[in-house]
């Protein structure tokens, strides 16, 4: 019997795949558990439409990420912090503080986990911070830390 997997089934198939499985296994396990649906013409058309929609959504997401990259590359995020001698900060600037500053000054909301910082910023001046917007799109944001 031909079935369309609705969920991943270990050793049999992944979600969205169409496979031939034994009738008994399909009727007694896959269909009853809601792990698969019978592959009829209408369900195949639905699956194709769903795949096209997912591709379209992924393309739109990539386009949005590219537009956001263009915006971020032009920005400079201004932060103020207390510092000691030699431009060393008392404390550090974290990705959370950068996100908050971007939200306040530029009305851009990002997740702090998207910032790829090896370590927090601990010195005055300009620092380039990498932001992973999408698996294929990364942007660089300039962060300017000045003395308070």
UniProtKB/Swiss-Prot annotation:
In its UniProt entry, what is this protein called?
Answer: Large ribosomal subunit protein bL9
User: Which NCBIfam families does the record match to this protein?
Assistant: L9
MF terms from GO for this chain are:
rRNA binding; structural constituent of ribosome
Q: Give an example GO biological process.
A: translation
Q: Does the keyword rRNA-binding apply?
A: yes
PROSITE patterns xrefs: RIBOSOMAL_L9
Q: What does this protein do?
A: Binds to the 23S rRNA.
Is this entry keyworded rRNA-binding?
Answer: yes
Q: InterPro entries, alphabetically? A: Ribosomal_bL9 (IPR000244), Ribosomal_bL9/RNase_H1_N (IPR009027), Ribosomal_bL9_bac/chp (IPR020594), Ribosomal_bL9_C (IPR020069), Ribosomal_bL9_C_sf (IPR036791), Ribosomal_bL9_N (IPR020070), Ribosomal_bL9_N_sf (IPR036935)
